Amino acid sequence: MNIVMFFFDNYMFSDFNKSSLEIACIENDIGTVKKIINLNPNLDISHCLNLAIESKNYQIVKFLLKKNISNSVLLEAYDCACINGKISIMELLIQYLNNKSIVS
């Protein structure tokens, strides 16, 4: 295996995807969010979820909630929505949390 390709595939590309995902969450670009997550489903999306909440990007928040998110990340997202006064997103998170068993 080419060492340059190994490095690109395992380090730089995932960093590039994470930065692109963060920008897409802020800019409400759901198409890009879906493409990046489908290409790399193991990306840590917790920070991106908070960025989408802060930017009031409801559809992106809704999409990210469909991913396997830990209870602690969900509770942090709810705190972020409360702090930023994002009522529609708070309601979405409450609805989602009510349908999920919360055990810390």
Curated annotation (Swiss-Prot):
ANK repeats lie at residues 16-43, 44-73, 75-102. Pfam families: Ank_2 (PF12796). The keyword Repeat applies. InterPro entries: Ankyrin_rpt, Ankyrin_rpt-contain_sf. SUPFAM superfamilies: Ankyrin repeat (SSF48403). Keywords: ANK repeat, Repeat. This is Putative ankyrin repeat protein L677. It comes from Acanthamoeba polyphaga mimivirus.
